Amino acid sequence: DTGALAISPSLYTKLSFDPSRDLKGVTMLAYSPHLLVVHPSVPATTLAELVALSKTQPLNFAVTALGSAPHLAGVAVERATGAKWQYIPYKGGSQAIADTVGGQAQVLMNGMLATLPHVQSGKLKLIGVSKRTRMPLIGGTPTIAEQGVKDFESGTWQGLLMPASTPPAILSRLNAELSRIIRSTDIRAKLVGQGAEVVTMTVPEFDRFFNAE
Protein backbone atom coordinates (compact mmCIF):
# COMPACT_ATOMS: atom_id res chain seq x y z
CA ASP A 1 0.00 0.00 0.00
CA THR A 2 2.01 2.93 -1.26
CA GLY A 3 -0.55 5.46 -0.05
CA ALA A 4 0.96 5.22 3.43
CA LEU A 5 4.22 6.60 2.04
CA ALA A 6 2.41 9.65 0.70
CA ILE A 7 0.70 10.28 4.04
CA SER A 8 3.80 9.97 6.25
CA PRO A 9 5.42 13.40 5.61
CA SER A 10 2.21 15.14 6.70
CA LEU A 11 1.97 13.19 9.97
CA TYR A 12 5.55 12.69 11.14
CA THR A 13 8.11 15.45 11.63
CA LYS A 14 11.14 13.17 11.91
CA LEU A 15 11.15 10.66 9.09
CA SER A 16 14.38 8.83 8.33
CA PHE A 17 13.74 9.34 4.62
CA ASP A 18 11.96 11.66 2.21
CA PRO A 19 9.58 9.65 0.00
CA SER A 20 9.65 12.21 -2.82
CA ARG A 21 13.44 12.47 -2.76
CA ASP A 22 14.49 8.91 -1.96
CA LEU A 23 11.99 6.89 -3.99
CA LYS A 24 11.12 6.69 -7.66
CA GLY A 25 7.76 5.44 -8.85
CA VAL A 26 7.60 2.57 -11.33
CA THR A 27 3.84 2.28 -11.84
CA MET A 28 0.55 2.13 -10.05
CA LEU A 29 -1.06 -1.29 -10.19
CA ALA A 30 -4.51 -1.14 -8.61
CA TYR A 31 -6.86 1.08 -6.67
CA SER A 32 -9.75 0.12 -4.41
CA PRO A 33 -12.12 2.27 -2.34
CA HIS A 34 -12.68 1.92 1.38
CA LEU A 35 -15.79 0.29 2.78
CA LEU A 36 -17.52 1.61 5.89
CA VAL A 37 -18.85 -1.46 7.67
CA VAL A 38 -20.34 -2.35 11.04
CA HIS A 39 -20.89 -5.47 13.09
CA PRO A 40 -24.29 -7.03 12.18
CA SER A 41 -25.61 -6.32 15.68
CA VAL A 42 -25.37 -2.56 15.12
CA PRO A 43 -28.95 -1.31 14.49
CA ALA A 44 -28.08 0.98 11.59
CA THR A 45 -28.30 0.48 7.84
CA THR A 46 -27.43 3.99 6.62
CA LEU A 47 -24.76 6.53 7.47
CA ALA A 48 -27.35 8.87 8.99
CA GLU A 49 -28.61 6.11 11.28
CA LEU A 50 -25.05 5.19 12.26
CA VAL A 51 -24.16 8.80 13.08
CA ALA A 52 -27.33 9.22 15.15
CA LEU A 53 -26.58 6.01 17.04
CA SER A 54 -23.00 7.10 17.75
CA LYS A 55 -24.28 10.25 19.43
CA THR A 56 -26.28 8.22 21.93
CA GLN A 57 -23.60 5.60 22.56
CA PRO A 58 -20.06 6.22 21.26
CA LEU A 59 -19.06 3.32 19.04
CA ASN A 60 -15.69 1.56 18.96
CA PHE A 61 -14.07 2.34 15.61
CA ALA A 62 -11.35 -0.16 14.65
CA VAL A 63 -8.30 1.60 13.20
CA THR A 64 -6.11 -0.64 11.06
CA ALA A 65 -3.08 1.52 11.93
CA LEU A 66 -2.71 5.00 13.37
CA GLY A 67 -2.21 7.51 10.57
CA SER A 68 -3.30 5.09 7.87
CA ALA A 69 -5.58 6.09 5.01
CA PRO A 70 -8.58 4.26 6.55
CA HIS A 71 -7.93 6.03 9.88
CA LEU A 72 -7.87 9.46 8.22
CA ALA A 73 -10.98 8.57 6.21
CA GLY A 74 -12.78 7.71 9.44
CA VAL A 75 -11.72 11.03 10.98
CA ALA A 76 -12.96 12.87 7.88
CA VAL A 77 -16.38 11.20 8.13
CA GLU A 78 -16.53 11.95 11.87
CA ARG A 79 -15.75 15.63 11.35
CA ALA A 80 -18.17 15.99 8.44
CA THR A 81 -21.11 14.30 10.17
CA GLY A 82 -20.57 14.92 13.87
CA ALA A 83 -20.32 11.20 14.56
CA LYS A 84 -18.75 10.06 17.83
CA TRP A 85 -16.17 7.33 17.30
CA GLN A 86 -14.03 5.77 20.02
CA TYR A 87 -10.88 4.90 18.05
CA ILE A 88 -9.26 1.56 18.83
CA PRO A 89 -5.82 1.26 17.18
CA TYR A 90 -4.53 -2.04 15.81
CA LYS A 91 -1.24 -3.09 14.28
CA GLY A 92 -2.81 -4.21 11.03
CA GLY A 93 -5.97 -4.72 9.07
CA SER A 94 -6.39 -8.42 9.77
CA GLN A 95 -6.76 -7.94 13.54
CA ALA A 96 -9.01 -4.91 13.09
CA ILE A 97 -11.28 -6.96 10.83
CA ALA A 98 -11.22 -9.93 13.20
CA ASP A 99 -12.26 -7.82 16.19
CA THR A 100 -15.04 -6.11 14.23
CA VAL A 101 -16.32 -9.49 13.05
CA GLY A 102 -16.12 -10.66 16.66
CA GLY A 103 -18.00 -7.63 17.98
CA GLN A 104 -15.20 -6.13 20.08
CA ALA A 105 -15.35 -3.14 17.71
CA GLN A 106 -18.54 -1.97 16.06
CA VAL A 107 -17.31 0.17 13.14
CA LEU A 108 -14.52 -0.28 10.61
CA MET A 109 -13.27 1.62 7.57
CA ASN A 110 -10.99 -0.55 5.48
CA GLY A 111 -9.88 -1.43 1.98
CA MET A 112 -12.42 -3.20 -0.19
CA LEU A 113 -10.27 -6.18 -1.16
CA ALA A 114 -9.78 -7.33 2.44
CA THR A 115 -13.23 -6.36 3.69
CA LEU A 116 -15.65 -7.37 0.94
CA PRO A 117 -15.48 -11.15 1.60
CA HIS A 118 -16.74 -10.56 5.15
CA VAL A 119 -19.61 -8.44 3.82
CA GLN A 120 -20.52 -11.14 1.31
CA SER A 121 -20.49 -13.79 4.03
CA GLY A 122 -22.76 -11.72 6.28
CA LYS A 123 -20.14 -11.28 9.00
CA LEU A 124 -20.07 -7.51 8.46
CA LYS A 125 -22.79 -5.08 7.36
CA LEU A 126 -22.01 -2.53 4.67
CA ILE A 127 -23.00 1.08 5.34
CA GLY A 128 -21.30 2.93 2.48
CA VAL A 129 -18.49 2.94 -0.06
CA SER A 130 -15.94 5.73 -0.32
CA LYS A 131 -16.22 6.13 -4.07
CA ARG A 132 -17.94 8.88 -6.01
CA THR A 133 -20.04 6.41 -7.99
CA ARG A 134 -21.87 3.26 -6.93
CA MET A 135 -20.35 -0.15 -7.62
CA PRO A 136 -22.44 -2.96 -9.16
CA LEU A 137 -20.21 -5.50 -7.39
CA ILE A 138 -21.70 -4.52 -4.02
CA GLY A 139 -25.29 -4.23 -5.14
CA GLY A 140 -25.32 -0.52 -5.72
CA THR A 141 -24.83 0.36 -2.04
CA PRO A 142 -25.01 4.18 -1.69
CA THR A 143 -21.71 6.00 -1.55
CA ILE A 144 -20.69 7.99 1.51
CA ALA A 145 -20.85 11.12 -0.65
CA GLU A 146 -24.47 10.34 -1.55
CA GLN A 147 -25.24 9.99 2.14
CA GLY A 148 -24.28 13.53 3.00
CA VAL A 149 -20.48 13.82 2.99
CA LYS A 150 -20.06 15.92 -0.14
CA ASP A 151 -17.37 14.83 -2.63
CA PHE A 152 -16.04 12.24 -0.16
CA GLU A 153 -13.65 9.77 -1.71
CA SER A 154 -10.87 7.70 -0.21
CA GLY A 155 -9.15 4.48 -1.04
CA THR A 156 -6.10 2.30 -1.12
CA TRP A 157 -3.70 2.23 -4.01
CA GLN A 158 -1.01 -0.30 -4.70
CA GLY A 159 2.06 0.47 -6.73
CA LEU A 160 5.75 -0.26 -7.05
CA LEU A 161 8.48 2.17 -6.07
CA MET A 162 12.25 1.75 -6.22
CA PRO A 163 15.24 3.58 -4.74
CA ALA A 164 15.74 6.93 -6.46
CA SER A 165 19.16 5.76 -7.66
CA THR A 166 17.60 3.05 -9.86
CA PRO A 167 18.69 3.58 -13.50
CA PRO A 168 15.91 4.95 -15.75
CA ALA A 169 16.28 2.00 -18.14
CA ILE A 170 15.42 -0.44 -15.35
CA LEU A 171 12.44 1.65 -14.27
CA SER A 172 11.15 1.71 -17.85
CA ARG A 173 11.60 -2.05 -18.29
CA LEU A 174 9.82 -2.82 -15.02
CA ASN A 175 7.03 -0.42 -15.95
CA ALA A 176 6.48 -2.10 -19.31
CA GLU A 177 6.50 -5.63 -17.89
CA LEU A 178 4.26 -4.89 -14.92
CA SER A 179 1.80 -2.98 -17.08
CA ARG A 180 1.61 -5.93 -19.46
CA ILE A 181 1.03 -8.41 -16.63
CA ILE A 182 -1.55 -6.35 -14.76
CA ARG A 183 -3.54 -5.79 -17.95
CA SER A 184 -3.68 -9.51 -18.76
CA THR A 185 -7.20 -10.91 -18.89
CA ASP A 186 -6.91 -13.29 -15.93
CA ILE A 187 -5.16 -10.85 -13.57
CA ARG A 188 -7.54 -8.02 -14.46
CA ALA A 189 -10.60 -10.24 -13.99
CA LYS A 190 -9.39 -11.41 -10.57
CA LEU A 191 -8.72 -7.88 -9.32
CA VAL A 192 -11.97 -6.44 -10.68
CA GLY A 193 -13.87 -9.35 -9.13
CA GLN A 194 -12.47 -8.35 -5.73
CA GLY A 195 -13.48 -4.71 -6.15
CA ALA A 196 -10.24 -3.18 -7.42
CA GLU A 197 -9.65 -1.00 -10.43
CA VAL A 198 -6.63 -1.87 -12.56
CA VAL A 199 -4.64 1.34 -13.04
CA THR A 200 -1.33 1.60 -14.86
CA MET A 201 0.78 4.72 -15.40
CA THR A 202 4.01 5.66 -17.08
CA VAL A 203 6.99 6.39 -14.84
CA PRO A 204 6.54 10.21 -15.12
CA GLU A 205 2.76 9.91 -14.57
CA PHE A 206 3.23 7.87 -11.41
CA ASP A 207 5.86 10.29 -10.12
CA ARG A 208 3.46 13.21 -10.58
CA PHE A 209 0.61 11.31 -8.93
CA PHE A 210 2.74 10.22 -5.97
CA ASN A 211 4.11 13.72 -5.35
CA ALA A 212 0.62 15.22 -5.62
CA GLU A 213 -0.70 12.73 -3.06
Where are these regions (language model features)?
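Short helices/loops that flank or line small-molecule/ion binding pockets
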Residues: 54-57, 75-80, 94-104, 108, ...
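Beta->alpha turn/N-cap motifs
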Residues: 1-4, 8, 93, 110-115, ...
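Short beta-strand and adjacent tight-turn residues that come in two discontinuous sequence segments
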Residues: 28, 90, 109-110, 129, ...
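Small-residue (glycine/proline)-centered packing/hinge motifs flanked by hydrophobic/aromatic residues
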Residues: 13-20, 133-151
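Paired acidic/hydrophobic, glycine-rich loop segments that form the ligand-binding mouth/hinge
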Residues: 1, 60-62, 106-110, 125-128
